[in-house]
Amino acid sequence: MGQLEESSELTLDFTKLEKVGKQVSDTRAAGGAEHDPGVIPVAVQNADTKEVILVAYTNEFAMKESFAKKKLILWSTSRNKLWFKGETSGETFDLLEAYVNCEQNSLLYIVRPCRGGICHTKNAAGAPRNCYYRKIDFETLKLTNVNP
């Protein structure tokens, strides 16, 4: 586990979308990837608990794969390839519904976990967490782990 995932310090990456945009631009300038790397954000919500468990990205190909397979399939902006959620961890998700926002520039996927959590981090009991397991203190900007 990295320092970023366990830290109580707030270290937000406000350049993430800039990096993603540059990656898309560079890929297109180089002749394009097998599939267009243009992406939009996807909020992923647990159908049963209503928790937002992840915010990630999809491109058109990943979205269509998700819809066809009824599974959570995303686009990895760090690896620039399809991300079959749970392919290595076994933490897969059934895709139950999909919604688009008013400007049609982001999606909401309603999913049901097939086993448990979604995040690569684990709590003290060894169970996978959801990605939003740290709460920000408004005064100090310190993080508190709500699922230690």
Task: Label each PLM-derived region with a short phrase.
Residues 2-39, 46-148:
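C-terminal binding/interaction regions
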